[in-house]
Design a protein with these regions (language model features):
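Extracytoplasmic small-molecule ligand-binding "clamshell" domains
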Residues: 1-40, 185
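Short helix-initiation/N-cap motifs at beta->coil->alpha
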Residues: 16-27, 69, 107-122, 158
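A ligand-binding cleft/hinge motif common to bilobed small-molecule-binding domains
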Residues: 24, 40-49, 93-98, 121-122, ...
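Short loop->beta-strand "edge-of-pocket" segments that line small-molecule binding or catalytic clefts
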Residues: 75-91, 105
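Extended ligand-binding regions for polar small-molecule ligands
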Residues: 1-10, 80-81, 88-89, 161-198
Length: 205
């Protein structure tokens, strides 16, 4: 959100965050109700459906565990209770990895990650499968963030980009140039560090 705000400000455009129903995103974009989709929008598998910025962030699907759990890798998840948000990229990645999920004691879904972290804190589950970007944000925003660790092994990787209506190169180019300027002057890294505790951006690298 802050990244999009800064881009709009530099371009002299009014920033209007518009919540949408995710399954209506194409209709909203094609009708002109929104100008772009900029919300953890995965490029993979959609490369030809939109006019894209270059990827601004790499995202992986990972597991979060408590620091004292003794879980250090995928093998340690055998027999454990794993939770994942319903209809998330992490759930899709788990469905594609039956060899791994077959070792779990239980794989269950949750409606949101706040609930998942409460379950993990209470010991109701042993691990949460989720986006590394969201994991970093959740952990960074918690007073007890040092209680949690992200396993180094990753389930899958994807790239985040900004999706514009097919053919809208003019706005894409304006946004892209501004993002490159922000990467060069350190603003991208600064915003990323504020929200995620580290620089997770990829533009200009």
């Amino acid at each position: 959100l802050e990244l999009a705000q800064e881009v709009a400000k530099r371009l002299g455009l009014e920033f209007v965050p518009q919540p949408i129903a995710w399954d209506a995103k194409d209709m909203e974009l094609n009708s002109g109700t929104i100008d772009c989709i900029w919300n953890g929008f995965t490029m993979n598998g959609r490369e030809d459906d939109y006019t894209w910025s270059t990827p601004y962030m790499d995202n992986s699907q990972v597991f979060v565990v408590t620091a004292d759990s003794g879980i250090e890798n995928f093998a340690d998840l055998a027999g454990k209770i794993v939770e994942v948000q319903a209809d998330s990229s992490a759930e899709a990645a788990l469905k594609d990895n039956e060899e791994l999920t077959g070792t779990f004691g239980t794989l269950q879904t949750t409606p949101d990650y706040n609930t998942a972290f409460m379950d993990l804190e209470m010991g109701a589950v042993d691990a949460i499968a989720m986006d590394v970007i969201v994991a970093g944000y959740q952990i960074e925003q918690r007073d007890d963030g040092d209680k949690y660790v992200v396993l180094e092994e990753t389930l899958a990787s994807e790239e985040y980009g900004i999706g514009f209506k097919k053919g809208n190169e003019e706005l894409r180019d304006q946004v892209q140039t501004t993002l490159e300027d922000m990467a060069a002057d350190g603003t991208l890294a600064e915003i990323s560090d504020k929200w995620f505790g580290r620089d997770v951006t990829t533009i200009g690298k």
